[in-house]
């Protein structure tokens, strides 16, 4: 039903959300929130101050009701006007893109460079792996050498190679008597 078909009494008793829906259906274009409020005041024949108390609830209802969609910049429309793909395009701000330059030989060389760089990385990783394996071999050799040194040290403990000569007790007594 068109807004023109409603009586003034019916428009006064109509909920704000239903009235907004009818306004959008008749206009068939997006409207800013303030324009929507002005049109509602005009249709219901009330003062804008009379609507102020219900404005917050109306805005909430407009957001919740699935028939309406916010298009940004306080513009609203009916969801049925926009296919899903177009909604995303219209709602999201336009992204400025730079014009693509034609590929040059430098771009081709750059692509080759990427391949070379990848090959070098693989070679470096293989070298690192070889070094780790070599380190493991060295660690085993070091462990064997350390064990041999420990055994040699234990054998050396039994010998007296501190450079001191041993003196018998008898020799001590003789030295003391001479003094």
Curated annotation (Swiss-Prot):
Highest taxon of source: Bacteria
> Where is there biased composition of kind Acidic residues?
109-179
Q: Which Gene3D superfamilies match?
A: RNA polymerase, subunit delta, N-terminal domain (1.10.10.1250)
User: Its GO CC terms?
Assistant: DNA-directed RNA polymerase complex
Q: How does it assemble?
A: RNAP is composed of a core of 2 alpha, a beta and a beta' subunits. The core is associated with a delta subunit and one of several sigma factors.
Please give the InterPro entries that the UniProt record associates with this protein.
Asxl_HARE-HTH, RNAP_delta_N_dom_sf, RpoE
Q: What gene is this protein a product of?
A: rpoE
What residue stretches are annotated with the HTH HARE-type domain? 14-81
Please list where the region (Disordered) is annotated. 108-179
Q: Which GO terms describe its molecular function?
A: DNA-directed RNA polymerase activity
Q: Which PROSITE patterns match?
A: HTH_HARE (PS51913)
Q: Which Pfam families match?
A: HARE-HTH
Q: Which UniProt keywords apply?
A: DNA-directed RNA polymerase, Nucleotidyltransferase, Transcription, Transferase
Mind telling me what this protein is named? Probable DNA-directed RNA polymerase subunit delta
> What does the record give as the function of this protein?
Participates in both the initiation and recycling phases of transcription. In the presence of the delta subunit, RNAP displays an increased specificity of transcription, a decreased affinity for nucleic acids, and an increased efficiency of RNA synthesis because of enhanced recycling.
Q: Does the keyword Cytoplasm apply?
A: no
């Amino acid at each position: 039903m068109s807004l023109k078909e409603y009586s003034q009494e019916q428009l006064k008793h109509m909920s704000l959300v239903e009235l907004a829906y009818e306004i959008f259906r008749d206009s068939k274009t997006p409207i800013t929130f303030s324009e929507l409020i002005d049109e509602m005041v005009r249709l219901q024949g009330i003062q804008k101050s009379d609507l102020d108390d219900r404005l917050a609830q109306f805005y909430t209802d407009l957001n919740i009701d699935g028939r309406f969609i916010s298009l940004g910049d306080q513009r609203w429309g009916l969801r049925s006007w926009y296919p899903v793909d177009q909604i995303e395009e219209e709602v999201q701000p336009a992204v400025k893109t730079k014009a693509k330059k034609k590929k040059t030989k430098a771009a081709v060389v750059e692509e080759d460079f990427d391949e070379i760089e990848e090959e070098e990385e693989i070679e470096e990783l293989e070298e690192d792996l070889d070094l780790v394996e070599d380190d493991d071999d060295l660690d085993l050799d070091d462990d064997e050498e350390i064990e041999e040194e420990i055994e040699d040290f234990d054998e050396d403990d039994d010998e007296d190679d501190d450079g001191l000569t041993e003196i018998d007790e008898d020799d001590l007594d003789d030295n003391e008597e001479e003094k």
